[in-house]
């Protein structure tokens, strides 16, 4: 079961093999195994944060196109005041705008 769990976290087969070898060595490797789990937990937390940001973007785009469908056009939606957006989507729109500005500055 733990091997399946480690696979799902994205741990490499090389690292999973290392974990198995350490586990077979017994209690002398507890600290090393703990460190492996801590590192993999940090990797997974970073992936989850990235996925949450992606989900937030999709939520914003769903709202955007639902609003466009109700209005019959996408025109002007980007110019709506923050108060017109659901509160949870306001920081998402701000992040997307900042990213778009950064991209245009790089060009």
Spans of features found by a protein language model:
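Arg/Lys-rich, alpha-helical DNA-contact motif
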Residues: 1-107
């Amino acid at each position: 079961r733990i091997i399946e769990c480690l696979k799902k976290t994205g741990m490499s087969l090389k690292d999973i093999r290392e974990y198995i070898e350490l586990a077979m060595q017994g209690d002398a490797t507890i600290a090393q195994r703990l460190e492996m789990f801590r590192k993999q937990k940090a990797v997974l937390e970073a992936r989850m944060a990235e996925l949450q940001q992606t989900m937030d973007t999709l939520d914003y785009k769903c709202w955007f196109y639902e609003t466009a469908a109700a209005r019959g056009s996408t025109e002007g939606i980007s110019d709506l005041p923050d108060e017109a957006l659901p509160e949870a989507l306001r920081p998402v729109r701000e992040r997307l705008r900042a990213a778009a500005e950064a991209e245009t500055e790089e060009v």
